[in-house]
Amino acid sequence: ACNTATCVTHRLADFLSRSGGMAKNNFVPTNVGSKAF
């Protein structure tokens, strides 16, 4: 399992990028991750 915010954020970003290509362009984990969550 993945419990840390960083890990969850990256997994979420990866999931979104696989589900819809546009999500990857609108979501930047390195810049928004910690603030978005």
Swiss-Prot record:
One of its GO terms (molecular function) is hormone activity. InterPro entries: Calcitonin-like (IPR021117), Calcitonin/adrenomedullin (IPR021116), Calcitonin_CS (IPR018360), Calcitonin_gene-rel_peptide (IPR015476), Calcitonin_peptide-like (IPR001693). GO terms for biological process: adenylate cyclase-activating G protein-coupled receptor signaling pathway; regulation of cytosolic calcium ion concentration. Pfam families: Calc_CGRP_IAPP. The modification Phenylalanine amide is found at residue 37. Gene3D superfamilies: 6.10.250.2190. Keywords: Amidation, Disulfide bond, Hormone. GO terms for cellular component: extracellular space. Signal peptide: none annotated. The keyword Disulfide bond applies. Disulfide bonds join 2-7. CGRP induces vasodilation. It dilates a variety of vessels including the coronary, cerebral and systemic vasculature. Its abundance in the CNS also points toward a neurotransmitter or neuromodulator role. Belongs to the calcitonin family. This is Calcitonin gene-related peptide. It comes from Pelophylax ridibundus (Marsh frog).
